[in-house]
């Protein structure tokens, strides 16, 4: 399951004062998706009505359901609440100056879309669009180059079925108090990536309830964050539900390299990463 909505990142240009790494047009994301779309796995994709035909054409005959959705209409009130907090001086004053460029702190569209991942997966399950018991969320733009998928034709890795499988880029995540969770959010510390999550349908339903509770708590504390911070809170409240799978230090795109195939080479790669950390 994945999703793409054009939130105007093509206009986040450096000549307008934005950090250069933020600028990505809708066409850039479509190009990234072409790499992911080469997988033969069934896919459910949520997008806007105008992008639906283009995405269907890319998948070209592979088992795919593209669901058109107007997220601005459906999530209008929550988006307004996010925008209010992002403009609130009390919230802004908590952030370090260097964090102010990050879009989760100023773009309501970005914060909203990042926080809808579990909604999209559970909506796909509710609509009976998912044919397998194991379901993965993978970001639409996760595969920025063709070699990210490591030549896989079908992704079918034996993840722990009793857990929600997260993927981490830093070791040592400990969150003993909710204040520590909020501290991670405010300081934008990255442990868990938002780009991929794998679980059974049953665990996704359980996880969705937990995510919603964490999102509500975050907003009530006058804080906005993207999915990474919310997932840290989920880990704080229910660590037994979650398994942390290490990708290597800051190795955000190692998903298919370390958890792609069930062969000896992949096992040895993972062993190396666990020993030397990268």
Regions found by a protein language model. Give the residues of each.
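Short beta-strand-to-loop element that shapes/binds the nucleotide-sugar donor at the catalytic cleft/hinge
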Residues: 164-177
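GT-A fold catalytic core of metal-dependent nucleotide-sugar glycosyltransferases
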Residues: 109, 113-167
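Non-catalytic accessory regions outside enzyme or core folds
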Residues: 1-15, 260-271, 275-278
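Short secondary-structure boundary/capping segments
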Residues: 14-21, 60, 151-154, 182, ...
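A structural signal for short, well-ordered beta-strand segments and their strand-loop junctions
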Residues: 1, 44-47, 134-139, 165-168, ...
């Amino acid at each position: 399951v994945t999703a793409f909505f054009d939130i105007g990142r093509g206009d986040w240009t450096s000549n307008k004062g934005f950090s250069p790494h933020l600028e990505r047009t809708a066409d850039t994301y479509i190009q990234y998706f072409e790499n992911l779309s080469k997988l033969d796995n069934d896919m459910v994709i949520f997008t806007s009505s105008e992008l639906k035909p283009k995405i269907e054409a890319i998948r070209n005959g592979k088992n795919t359901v593209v669901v058109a959705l107007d997220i601005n209409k459906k999530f209008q009130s929550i988006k307004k609440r996010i925008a209010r907090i992002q403009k609130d001086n009390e919230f802004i004053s908590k952030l370090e100056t260097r964090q102010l460029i990050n879009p989760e702190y100023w773009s309501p569209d970005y914060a909203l879309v990042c926080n809808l991942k579990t909604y999209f997966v559970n909506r796909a399950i509710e609509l009976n669009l998912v044919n397998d018991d194991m379901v993965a969320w993978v970001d639409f733009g996760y595969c920025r180059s063709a070699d990210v998928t490591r030549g896989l034709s079908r992704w079918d890795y034996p993840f722990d079925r009793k857990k929600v499988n997260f993927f981490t880029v830093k070791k040592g995540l400990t969150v003993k108090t909710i204040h520590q969770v909020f501290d991670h959010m405010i300081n934008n510390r990255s442990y868990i990536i938002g780009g991929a999550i794998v679980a059974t349908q049953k665990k996704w339903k359980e996880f969705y309830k937990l995510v919603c509770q964490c999102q509500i708590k975050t907003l009530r504390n006058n804080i906005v964050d993207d999915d990474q911070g919310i997932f840290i809170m989920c880990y704080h409240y229910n660590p037994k539900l979650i398994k942390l799978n290490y990708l290597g230090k800051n190795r955000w795109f190692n998903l298919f390299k370390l958890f792609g195939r069930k062969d000896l080479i992949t096992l040895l790669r993972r062993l190396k990463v666990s020993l030397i950390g990268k």
